[in-house]
């Protein structure tokens, strides 16, 4: 049983020991596409930028920080499961955790997931572009996260506004399951938020609604302002001996 409200320091100390990135992080920064794979020009540009970030030539952006957090956890013994309607690419095309061969013959073939190829013996990274039902998918991921406390389980809304399609799951399970049934859950909800000009119901994750649901340390509501905060926020969700739902309003 995970101890409640235990905020002991993280047991992992490697990032304080050296300024050089560990091998798995460098491997992910130095992405190599499969031979003969044809990618979109935009994806190529993002990959080239990440290689430059790995060399210290560019500052880390949000997508790189998030992917590096996953890479570090995968090689430290924590499986990562990410699902959502557009999570392979990311709503604002920042993630690109799944790359597609533009010359593929069959639609479901020709995909390459760099986070599955970090090193021998790493844990599984699963990224699922899910069905268009927030309620069904979020409910499933909540159950998965409660049953697998040593896996980082994330659900991403296509836009933060759309999460209200699963409001019953949020109200009755995620924010109150521990108080009602003693069910600990480390589920992460990623809610893209704050982009104007995307049309009606495409710019606000409605932070105020989640703050109204906060009571007695039942959930964590975070609005990171730097890429570094995003990196450590995701790692902390697994490394500290505490399992609380995490709601992240992502840029």
Whereabouts are the PLM-identified features?
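Flexible, glycine-rich loop/tail regions that form catalytic "lids" or insertion modules at the edges
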Residues: 1-251
């Amino acid at each position: 049983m995970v101890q409640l409200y235990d905020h002991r320091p993280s047991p992992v100390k490697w990032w304080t020991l050296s300024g050089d990135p560990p091998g798995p992080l460098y491997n992910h920064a130095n992405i190599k596409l499969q031979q003969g794979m044809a990618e979109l020009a935009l994806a190529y540009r993002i990959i080239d930028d990440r290689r430059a970030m790995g060399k210290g030539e560019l500052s880390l952006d949000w997508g790189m920080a998030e992917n590096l957090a996953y890479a570090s956890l995968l090689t430290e013994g924590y499986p990562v499961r990410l699902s959502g309607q557009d999570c392979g690419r990311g709503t604002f095309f920042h993630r690109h955790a799944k790359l597609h061969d533009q010359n593929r013959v069959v639609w479901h073939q020709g995909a390459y997931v760099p986070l599955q190829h970090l090193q021998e013996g790493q844990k599984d990274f699963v990224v699922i572009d899910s069905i268009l039902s927030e309620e069904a998918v979020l409910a499933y991921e909540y159950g998965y996260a409660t049953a697998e406390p040593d896996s980082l389980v994330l659900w991403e809304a296509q836009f933060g506004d759309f999460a209200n399609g699963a409001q019953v799951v949020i109200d009755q399970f995620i924010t109150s399951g521990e108080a009602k049934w003693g069910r600990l859950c480390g589920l992460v909800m990623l809610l893209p938020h704050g982009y104007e000009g995307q049309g009606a119901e495409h710019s606000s994750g409605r932070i105020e609604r989640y703050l109204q649901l906060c009571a007695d340390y039942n959930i964590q509501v975070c609005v990171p302002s730097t890429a570094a905060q995003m990196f450590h926020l995701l790692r902390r969700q697994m490394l500290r001996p505490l399992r609380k739902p995490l709601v992240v309003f992502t840029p």
